[in-house]
Amino acid sequence: MHRLTPWQDWSKYVDAALGADPDADPGARATPMPTLPAPRGPGKGASVAARKEFNRQLSDQMTELSQWWLRRMVTAQQPIHEKLTLLWHNHFATSAQKVRFAAYMAAQNQKLRSLSLGDFHTLAYAMLTDAAMMHWLDAQTNTAKAPNENLAREFMELFTLGHGNGYTEDDVRQGARALTGWVIRPTGQTMVVPKRHDRTAKTIFGVTGNFDASGFCDTGWPSRNRRNTSPDGCGSSWRPIPNRRRRRSTALSPRTAATATCGR
């Protein structure tokens, strides 16, 4: 892309690339995502050998998933969608070493790919309720009786607002209460168990309501994030996509400025 210097040429290239269906790419069709069913756990009282075998299966599946994605990135004829998937994968960083279940990581990878060109709010909510992310940040231990702040804190600090940028410790605590009750089913689907959820009023960023995860995402982030996100911030995410080498930003300014809100 860096060889396309005239604005009109690279603009048409970008429009065509972003408008393409990633699943229709011949390279994508040639590299379907592997099926990675979660192996059956060894259970209580299992032998050392059975536990080792379970761990080996988990490790083998994670290796298979990693190798598949590398093949997909190399094989895709139009790499923009895989670059965007990688960009969001780096932004919503999740540790495969802790998650361990390749099925969770594979589902997250596909969400990032399918939502990579949509609005940031939709993507953020998908990650907020994602099995891999929930496992990584201990969201299953977040209950009305014993709130866990990990997910609420990381969502504000790393994924949306930025460290110390417009939220307080009380906002984190109230946000954690809004996120109580979520669990991961054996199928990898996530859901709320009502009796584990805090159904009392919470006050987040000065707004009081009986917030759940959706309300937290709506009230606890978008309006403030739109004010606090700069064109340069969106531009810094965009620049690695066309080329590794640092380029003058003037040509990208009209597009990055238009997406500076990074919201709905």
Where are these regions (language model features)?
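N-terminal accessory alpha/beta regions
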Residues: 1-115
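Active-site substrate-binding loop specific to GH73 endo-beta-N-acetylglucosaminidase modules
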Residues: 18, 45-51, 65, 101-264
